[in-house]
UniProtKB/Swiss-Prot annotation:
<dbReference type="GO" id="GO:0006412">
    <property type="term" value="P:translation"/>
</dbReference>
<dbReference type="InterPro" id="IPR035977">
    <property type="entry name" value="Ribosomal_bL36_sp"/>
</dbReference>
<dbReference type="GO" id="GO:1990904">
    <property type="term" value="C:ribonucleoprotein complex"/>
</dbReference>
<comment type="similarity">
    <text>Belongs to the bacterial ribosomal protein bL36 family.</text>
</comment>
<dbReference type="GO" id="GO:0003735">
    <property type="term" value="F:structural constituent of ribosome"/>
</dbReference>
<keyword id="KW-0687">Ribonucleoprotein</keyword>
<protein>
    <recommendedName>
        <fullName>Large ribosomal subunit protein bL36B</fullName>
    </recommendedName>
</protein>
<keyword id="KW-0689">Ribosomal protein</keyword>
<dbReference type="Pfam" id="PF00444">
    <property type="entry name" value="Ribosomal_L36"/>
</dbReference>
<dbReference type="GO" id="GO:0005840">
    <property type="term" value="C:ribosome"/>
</dbReference>
<dbReference type="InterPro" id="IPR000473">
    <property type="entry name" value="Ribosomal_bL36"/>
</dbReference>
<dbReference type="InterPro" id="IPR047621">
    <property type="entry name" value="Ribosomal_L36_bact"/>
</dbReference>
């Protein structure tokens, strides 16, 4: 999982889902799990 300042680019990729957990923003991608990231 990458920790990014901005997850804007990752959320545009196919299969990406934006999820809020514990006050942090996560991007989960089941199609391509390499694009997993957290902001904050």
């Amino acid at each position: 999982m990458k920790v990014r300042n901005s997850i804007k680019a990752l959320k545009k990729l196919p299969g990406a889902q934006v999820v809020r957990r514990r006050g942090r923003v996560f991007v989960i991608n089941k199609q391509n799990p390499r694009n997993k990231a957290r902001q904050g």
